Amino acid sequence: MDVLLSLPQPELFKTTVIPFLANRNIIKSEAILSNLHSIFYVAIFYHIWFLFGKWILFPHLVKWKLDYDQKHNVKKDEKTTSERQAQHYKKKYTSLINQSSVHLISLLQSIVVLYYSLKFLLDPKASAEPYQTSHSRVFTENRDTQVICIFAIGYFVWDIYISTMYSTFPFVVHGIISTVVFCIGLKPYIQYYAPVFLMFELSNPSLNFRWFGIKFLPQKSKFCSLLLLLNNLTLMVVFFAARIAWGWFQIGKLCYDFYQVRNEPGFLVFDTIVILAGNFVLDILNVIWFSTMVSVAAKVLKKGESVDKVTKNEQ
């Protein structure tokens, strides 16, 4: 992944893009301007993997799954014409390929940002010793946290495009807000907290494994149902630890840091409001999502419904 950061800046960026953005004060941060080409490369990297999934990895897998479902699970409706059935099959085939490719990139990016974030956070010399004060946590920047912001922004820029093409408006908004938040981090402003809040991504692998399990594993298999159950339990534990316990603790710490530096010259009121509002909304949503997980788990335990039946009802 480091090779993406070492690629040279395209001539178009040097002569046209960066001067245009800088001269019109569209982007004032030198850190963002100097890393704009790396953000572009990261976005392209994710899109190449998306195209790999869409055209190479998933077509045969999706065809096998749909044919398997037709043979074992789906009762044919005699009133439905073969033409309508073919149209429905094609629509489902295309949709599943696209969504599978999106989830592949979601899984890939979580691995990438977790690698860089954990590498930073688990090194006391990098993440603890230089950040003993509120001032350092809000205003300090270094290449490690800068790189984390670059990979996050590159992914969310790609996410805006892909959500516009294949998803719904709320996902586009999520991508825009996330891009803005990490651009604020790259400015730099609270750059230290970029890897801290990316610990939310610890729940992402289990979330994507769950999606792939529901879509591709034989639901009548007891072994596959057990795998889904174990993954769901892992998801709940990690989700609570990373997004609820860790998330609320860190937003409290961030509020304290902002309060401590509120009178310093570099304190940015608007950026602070955007970051706090975005994080509070996300933390509240995490509580709502976790309560939904708990209610589904309770339904499985109390009513004895199988995991696959419950997850089908969720879709």
From Swiss-Prot:
Localisation: Endoplasmic reticulum membrane
Q: Enumerate the Lumenal topological stretches.
A: 60-101, 166-170, 247-264
Question: Keywords of this protein's UniProt record, alphabetized?
Answer: Endoplasmic reticulum, Membrane, Transmembrane, Transmembrane helix
Q: Where are the transmembrane segments?
A: 39-59, 102-122, 145-165, 171-190, 226-246, 265-285
At the top level, the lineage of the source is Eukaryota
GO CC, any one term: endoplasmic reticulum membrane
Q: How does it sit in the membrane?
A: Multi-pass membrane protein
One record GO biological process: lipid homeostasis
For the Cytoplasmic compartment, the record's topological domain ranges are 1-38, 123-144, 191-225, 286-315
Task: Describe the location of the TLC domain by residue ranges.
Answer: 95-302
Please state the protein's primary subcellular location: endoplasmic reticulum
Q: Further notes on this entry?
A: Present with 1920 molecules/cell in log phase SD medium.
- Name of the protein in its database record: Uncharacterized TLC domain-containing protein YPR114W
Which organism's genome codes for this protein? Saccharomyces cerevisiae (strain ATCC 204508 / S288c)
